[in-house]
Amino acid sequence: DEMENCPLCPKLLERTELFGGIIREKVLLQTEPDVWMPVYILIPPAKEGRPGCVLAPHGHQGAGKYSVAGCREIPAVAEAIDRFHYDYGLYLAKLGYVALCPDARGFGERRDKAFQKEEEEAFMRGTCFHLAHMAEPLGMTVAGMNTWDLMRLIDYVEERGEWRTDDLGCVGFSGGGLQTLYLAAL
């Protein structure tokens, strides 16, 4: 019934240079004890001054952070990007913002694979339905857990200290819009 604070223990898993000088980092953050959230961080080319940040939570049916960060290696993700303009994190980085694209609980690398196959179609969906049914008897909601994780992501931005926190935004489509709305309320 309550989220437990803990050290973030950030782990840099990969750092890749994309086209146009954008850097994509994959970072793993501990949002609660033994609860880890993978995040793609898209960093624009260096300019004068520190860039602002935008949290870019994903919605449903987009394979978590992959589509928002513009990862086109998986054909179904590329199709979602083309169909729904789902790569808004990458677009923000092209505009000069640092875009932080996390996997919400039940999606991407955080989905419960016991309920799904490893096929591409299953990868596009989440398992938040199952997670919700496990959380509710404990007095918790998936939306609340995801909002907590976004708050911890802001903690990481502040702890890292490389980017402006007075120019911090959040934008998402569908379920990512819901996460944005709840985060703004807190």
Protein language model regions, located:
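An acidic- and aromatic-residue-enriched active-site/binding cleft used to recognize and process polar
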Residues: 32, 44, 59-60, 104-107, ...
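Short amphipathic alpha-helices and their capping/turn segments at secondary-structure boundaries
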Residues: 39-47, 89-92, 182-185
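N-terminal cap/lid segment of alpha/beta-hydrolase-fold proteins
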Residues: 2-55
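Short, hydrophobic/aromatic alpha-helical segments in well-folded domains
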Residues: 25, 42, 87-88, 153, ...
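Cap/lid segment of the alpha/beta-hydrolase catalytic domain
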Residues: 49, 56-151
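Primarily recognizes the serine-hydrolase "nucleophile elbow" in alpha/beta-hydrolase
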Residues: 145, 152-186
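Beta-sheet entry/capping signal
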Residues: 38, 52-54, 96-99, 167-169
